Amino acid sequence: MDIVATTQKELYGWYAYAWAAEPFMVVAVATYIPQLLQSYARQNAVLADDHSQPCDSPPVPFPGDPGVPTDPGIPPNNSLSSSVPWFLRANEIQLLESPDTVHTMKDHKAKPTQPTCVIKFFGIYIDTASFPLYTFSLSVLLQVVVVISMSGAADRGRFRKQLLLFFGIAGALTTGLFVFITPKRYYLGSFLAIVSNAAFGAATVCGNAYLPVLAAGMKDGTTSEEPSEPSTPSDTSKPASRSENTPLLSASGVDYETGESSNTAEIVKIDHRANVSARISGTGVALGYLAGFIVQIISIYLVITTGSTTWSLRLALLIVGVWWLIFQIPVLMWLKPRPGPPLPIKTDPQNHPWTATLDRVTNGGWSYVTYGWKTLLVTFKEARQMKDVALFLVGWFLVSDGITTINSTAVLFAQGELRMSPANLAVMGMLVVISGISGAKLTPLIGGTRASPIKSIVVVVSLAAAVPAYGILGFFFTNIGLKNPWELYVLAVWYGFALGGLNTVCRSTFSMLIPRGKEAVFFSLFSVTDKGSSVLGPLLVGLIVDKTHNLRHAFYLLLVLLITPIGLFLMIDMERGRKEAEYLETVEE
């Protein structure tokens, strides 16, 4: 089947998807949703030692409440001097809305005695800092299930664009609906966070599915001015091109043919498409980060000018949702449907009578769900045959879990322990993004072109492990070890560099260990491992906080998650891994 030529307008439509969605992760998930959920949890909390007594904190005012003054950030009869500059007032208000204590910026260095606050969550009492962590863990679990279940529908058949738009609009609406969530409806806030994060993950995977098709439509690495019509296949018994049925879960965006790799011309063609796909993907990532940067700037201004209250956080999330929704328009107008090939006959539900009813009820949807799960299972079985791939994936599972959980833990620690304002936390998030771009560009240069990729991974993981290790120092020293807000700014730059570098070097190393011609299915497992690991970290951190009521203890867990895989990575033999991959290249699927 011929591929329709990719036009410049269609490419802009794909870029619009990244431009629309990425601010959700950069701004909403990384900065404001954890703050809002923790603030609401504390406002509804009770004392840990007496559940009949609420924690001593008045609710944070926001427009719409009876008796709220014109400036919702400044309560009536405020004892703070009105001469405090506007750029410091955000910090002052954040301290005032702290649920455990009321003190001015002059008392910031003092550590007042704080009661331990807990909130009821599914029938049990948990620490208020655990509430956003459990929420995030549940959201990632749902995201993994949704992504695997819908992968077949987006990769095969006519649903690719429909699913991209559906999940994009669903994510935008659920993010914008945060503006209506008041403190007493904190459970709804948790629900919106779970649904919006799952929608983001599904939309991202749908977007990745377009990469190989768009790259295949650029014959000489350039777009076509006029779209060409696909020709009718002369032999319907032939399998569809690999560029059209690359598994949706592939995070690599690389298109490879399924034929023998011995043909030199075919290899050149494959490498060309890989380069084109990488170029498109890189531009999309850059535009996504730029959009996140712009929305973060807007949100910081909004948060400061509205008083750094929970109302400010909700407005910031509304901006993210509106941004995401508006830029679905160019996606709708410019991106082609790009239908994929039909499901393989062996997955037809008619071969399994007991599923025929389910497939009929879901209008054929059940076939696509089962196809996604079966594809993942086949890939997992193949990976088990390769020792070095298995070692890498286990190490990647732990590292990805640890480095991802650092972000949410740091935000909650900064808000709860260091009393940093939402605006300051947003600045911290921007530093992570900027530094992450630098890390992605510079990490491949570590040790020169002849450096072992395993050594590069060990170096970057060690850099990441320094973040929780530094937090642990706070148990033993009074002036260092995340005792001051400025320390978090420094660690944000350090962490961002490690985060950007880790994703780059791990992806490239994994690509060296897998069989040629099976890159897409193996990268699907790489992607699912990445997403699935993020369920465990927040869950364990939440359990630690519930037990100790001290978020700093979580740094021990994060340190273990990051240093343990170093031993696994050092056990990988790249030469042995390449030989295993070459052997599997000769094995028919």
Curated annotation (Swiss-Prot):
Amino acid composition bias (Pro residues), ranges on this chain: 56-66
Q: Which CDD domains does the record cross-reference, listed alphabetically?
A: MFS_Atg22_like
**Pfam families with a match to the protein in the record:** ATG22
Q: Which residues form a coiled coil?
A: none
Which key words are in the record? Amino-acid transport, Autophagy, Glycoprotein, Membrane, Transmembrane, Transmembrane helix, Transport, Vacuole
Q: Which residues are glycosylated?
A: N77, N275
Q: Where is the composition biased (Polar residues)?
A: 235-249
Protein name in UniProt: Autophagy-related protein 22
InterPro entries, per this entry? Atg22 (IPR044738), Atg22-like (IPR024671), ATG22/LtaA_families (IPR050495), MFS_trans_sf (IPR036259)
* Assigned GO CC terms: fungal-type vacuole membrane
Q: Corresponding gene?
A: ATG22
Report the function annotation for this chain.
Vacuolar effluxer which mediate the efflux of amino acids resulting from autophagic degradation. The release of autophagic amino acids allows the maintenance of protein synthesis and viability during nitrogen starvation.
Would you say which domain of life the source belongs to?
A: Eukaryota
Note whether Transmembrane occurs among the keywords.
yes
Q: Which residues cross the membrane?
A: 13-33, 128-148, 163-183, 187-207, 284-304, 315-335, 389-409, 426-446, 457-477, 486-506, 525-545, 554-574
- Kindly list the places in or outside the cell where this protein is found, as annotated in its UniProt entry: Vacuole membrane
Which family does the UniProt entry place this protein in?
Belongs to the ATG22 family.
User: Single Gene Ontology BP term?
Assistant: amino acid transmembrane export from vacuole
Please give, as recorded in its UniProt entry, the membrane topology of this protein: Multi-pass membrane protein
Region called Disordered, residue ranges: 48-73, 221-257
Does Ribonucleoprotein appear among the keywords?
Answer: no
